[in-house]
Amino acid sequence: MRLVTLAPAKVNLVLRVGPVRADGYHDLRTLMVPLDLGDRVDVRVSARRGPVRCTVPGRPELHGPENLAARAAEAFRRRFGVDRAVSIRIEKRTPVTAGLGGGSSDAAAVLRCLARAFRVRDRAALAALALEIGSDVPFFLGPGPAWAAGRGERLSPADVPPLDLVLVYPADPSLAIRAGDAYRWLDEARAGGPQAPRRLGRPGRWRPSLLGNDLQAPCVARKPALQALLGLLVGAGATAAIMSGSGPTVFGVFPGRGAARGAALAIQGRAKGGAAGVQVLLARTVRRHPRVSPWRSPRSASSPSTRRSSRPT
């Protein structure tokens, strides 16, 4: 059996960070939304016993058992007693270690594909398995935009209208940010100044005034070049611009698709003119995660009968 799906990237429209807990994690209140861009994940399940294999064309450093997608497949096999060989192929489009949830989304995509292949419908068991793999993975199993609390495992649906975004990812290795470092910098800033951990409050209705990220200030303090990227977005017409997750990707919210497209072109032009090493992505938030579909060959996908059957009903 061969299944394919999109592993969407995400942004955090809101990220509020509470104090560090006894287990070393922080309590969070975050609003995450999936995007219409992401990785293409192709999962093949053999009829024979065998290992899990994971390949990422063009990114050999992401091959192998340490990839979150491969770890998700192994965890699924252990939990549900599966010994079939599983081959995973990921066409990587979401930047890596960017605050966009790419690896977590790939892992969730594999879980969704395997759940369909083996007819696993126990959502609670899948959610628990997802949390073992990573804090963001449960979100990518859910229906769409959601408020997440705790480590990210307590999810409640959120009504977020489609938003047109421009994402700017600095590919310069000196601007890379490990998630653990971002939270440590926030803890250090709070310990050394008047900024106390905020009261997280309860999830509410989304409104633009909520846009914000507690990790942004300490990350910008350590990586001042991020402030220039935020300025590029505002200068190109964004109504607001913030960092996503633990960064270093920043994004701007624009009043429409045309405005976002024009801004993306302008920022790309600026990048060619001197702000080298940035990747500019045009995206829109979506209300649902993508479905898992049977793989179809390019020939069958382009046939008249397939085109008719693939139309929404």
Curated annotation (Swiss-Prot):
Q: Where is the active site?
A: K10, D136
- Tell me the PANTHER family matching this sequence: 4-DIPHOSPHOCYTIDYL-2-C-METHYL-D-ERYTHRITOL KINASE, CHLOROPLASTIC
Q: Which InterPro entries match?
A: GHMP_kinase_C_dom, GHMP_kinase_C_sf, GHMP_kinase_N_dom, IspE, Ribosomal_Su5_D2-typ_SF, Ribsml_uS5_D2-typ_fold_subgr
Write out the GO MF terms.
4-(cytidine 5'-diphospho)-2-C-methyl-D-erythritol kinase activity; ATP binding
Q: What family classification does the UniProt entry report for this protein?
A: Belongs to the GHMP kinase family. IspE subfamily.
| Pfam families (UniProt xref) | GHMP_kinases_C, GHMP_kinases_N
Q: Where is this region: Disordered?
A: 289-313
What phylogenetic lineage does the species belong to?
Bacteria, Pseudomonadati, Myxococcota, Myxococcia, Myxococcales
Which pathway does the record list? Isoprenoid biosynthesis; isopentenyl diphosphate biosynthesis via DXP pathway; isopentenyl diphosphate from 1-deoxy-D-xylulose 5-phosphate: step 3/6
- Keywords, comma-separated and alphabetical: ATP-binding, Isoprene biosynthesis, Kinase, Nucleotide-binding, Transferase
Q: What's an example Gene Ontology biological process for this entry?
A: terpenoid biosynthetic process
Superkingdom of the source species: Bacteria
Q: What is this protein called?
A: 4-diphosphocytidyl-2-C-methyl-D-erythritol kinase
Functional description taken from the UniProt entry: Catalyzes the phosphorylation of the position 2 hydroxy group of 4-diphosphocytidyl-2C-methyl-D-erythritol.
Q: What is its EC number?
A: 2.7.1.148
